[in-house]
Amino acid sequence: MREIVHIQAGQCGNQIGTKFWEVISDEHGIDQAGGYVGDSALQLERISVYYNESSSKKYVPRAALVDLEPGTMDSVRSGPFGQLFRPDNFIFGQTGAGNNWAKGHYTEGAELVDSVLDVVRKECEHCDCLQGFQLTHSLGGGTGSGMGTLLISKIREEYPDRIMNTFSVMPSPKVSDTVVEPYNATLSVHQLVENTDETYCIDNEALYDICFRTLKLTTPTYGDLNHLVSATMSGVTTSLRFPGQLNADLRKLAVNMVPFPRLHFFMPGFAPLTARGSQQYRALTVPELTQQMFDAKNMMAACDPRHGRYLTVATVFRGPMSMKEVDEQMLAIQNKNSSYFVEWIPNNVKVAVCDIPPRGLKMASTFIGNSTAIQELFKRISEQFSAMFRRKAFLHWFTGEGMDEMEFTEAESNMNDLVSEYQQYQDATVNDGEEAFEDEDEEEINE
């Protein structure tokens, strides 16, 4: 079966990752000790995508848990699903990265990275046909961003033909945890652009907004935010884990979603999101789901898709529903909002349908959009980055770990290039390609 190896790095990555395992263990009927307590053969049909089966009929997540300090690991281990994970797969240092990308990438992280790769290699060797890797991490801290990107490039070296998929928590515009977030994020994006096949951009601020506005929670905790993320992650991976009418795997997703190799940063969304009190007033229908899924308020990244255009979209519907209705709705959305889809990629919406809904819902849908509006997110980080970098503020923490200012300059220009690439394709029309070629010819003549 097409297996996926899951890696979670840093505090944020471990918390999101653990929540994800709780959600999918629940969907597959696996209890906290790893025993199967489900009631449907479908739950076990493709369980091997994420779990290894031990000799004692225990299902063990194919996951490596990585951090540079023991704290987060301890709380995972003492948490409800702590006994589920393989004890050897907890890999942690003692020093911590102190929110410093250079520590995670070059000094502390580099010392730990080989033991992580051993675990990853071991997991890969147990696989029949490895499909790819998924990493959960944040870009604002030190371990998830610095060591996470180090792991990506090392794994990329060893498994160049496997899909590399990340769930990356971006620093938010208003909610900041660390002052050096813009540095850490820019240095990470610099790596992600080159080394991953698909990156889901998740943003704490967007998650807070969803909790406040839509779910009507007055004081959302990180637990609530992580629950939203895990709902999305569970949705994105549904068609890998359950049989359905139209299936996608990581590679199919990548092929359909990434028109140009560098532009692989997606905005995820999820529907239905309803406040607990108003659930009984809404009917879950395919049109309702589609409507909500494309709504800007449902995006998990703090970018407004109305400010850009969709290059491609993938949607995953879950639950018993008619394919015909789904197709009609998708067509209707595209026709009605055609100005928000680039016209030079016809039929740029891919649909997957899976028969099994998430726990507690009759139907649900997950949205993955590759929109040029994501540049807002990079622009924001870039502005904060240059404001600090201009004054060389906080740089000594990074140069002290052996980094060079050149690296910062490179990372900054790479991110600015990314922004202008998104802009270029946002403005592109069907016919302007020919003019572009003519311009190139003229330039050559002038030279």
Curated annotation (Swiss-Prot):
Q: Which organism is it from?
A: Mus musculus (Mouse)
Supply the alphabetized keyword list. Cytoplasm, Cytoskeleton, GTP-binding, Isopeptide bond, Magnesium, Metal-binding, Microtubule, Nucleotide-binding, Phosphoprotein
Looking up PROSITE patterns in the UniProt record yields: TUBULIN (PS00227), TUBULIN_B_AUTOREG (PS00228)
Q: Self-association or partners: how does it assemble?
A: Dimer of alpha and beta chains. A typical microtubule is a hollow water-filled tube with an outer diameter of 25 nm and an inner diameter of 15 nM. Alpha-beta heterodimers associate head-to-tail to form protofilaments running lengthwise along the microtubule wall with the beta-tubulin subunit facing the microtubule plus end conferring a structural polarity. Microtubules usually have 13 protofilaments but different protofilament numbers can be found in some organisms and specialized cells.
Q: What does the entry's free-text domain comment contain?
A: The highly acidic C-terminal region may bind cations such as calcium.
What Pfam families has UniProt attached to this entry?
Tubulin, Tubulin_C
Q: Where is this motif: MREI motif?
A: 1-4
Tell me the InterPro entries matching this sequence: Beta-tubulin_BS, Beta_tubulin, Tub_FtsZ_C, Tubulin, Tubulin/FtsZ-like_C, Tubulin/FtsZ_2-layer-sand-dom, Tubulin/FtsZ_GTPase_sf, Tubulin_C
Where mainly found? cytoplasm
Q: Tell me how the protein is altered or processed after translation.
A: Some glutamate residues at the C-terminus are polyglycylated, resulting in polyglycine chains on the gamma-carboxyl group. Glycylation is mainly limited to tubulin incorporated into axonemes (cilia and flagella) whereas glutamylation is prevalent in neuronal cells, centrioles, axonemes, and the mitotic spindle. Both modifications can coexist on the same protein on adjacent residues, and lowering polyglycylation levels increases polyglutamylation, and reciprocally. Cilia and flagella glycylation is required for their stability and maintenance. Flagella glycylation controls sperm motility.
Its biological purpose? Tubulin is the major constituent of microtubules, a cylinder consisting of laterally associated linear protofilaments composed of alpha- and beta-tubulin heterodimers. Microtubules grow by the addition of GTP-tubulin dimers to the microtubule end, where a stabilizing cap forms. Below the cap, tubulin dimers are in GDP-bound state, owing to GTPase activity of alpha-tubulin.
Q: In its UniProt entry, what is this protein called?
A: Tubulin beta-6 chain
Q: Which PANTHER family match?
A: TUBULIN
One GO CC annotation, please?
Answer: mitotic spindle
Q: Required co-factor? A: Mg(2+)
Q: Which residues are recorded as binding GTP?
A: Q11, E69, S138, G142, T143, G144, N204, N226
The signal peptide annotation in the UniProt record is: none
Q: Which residues bind Mg(2+)?
A: E69
* Molecular functions per Gene Ontology: GTP binding; GTPase activity; metal ion binding; structural constituent of cytoskeleton
Q: Which positions does the record annotate as the modified residue 5-glutamyl polyglutamate?
A: E438
Modified residues annotated as Phosphoserine in this record: S172
Q: Which SMART domains match?
A: Tubulin (SM00864), Tubulin_C (SM00865)
Subcellular locations according to the entry: Cytoplasm, Cytoskeleton
State the family named in the UniProt similarity comment for this chain.
Belongs to the tubulin family.
Supply the gene name: Tubb6
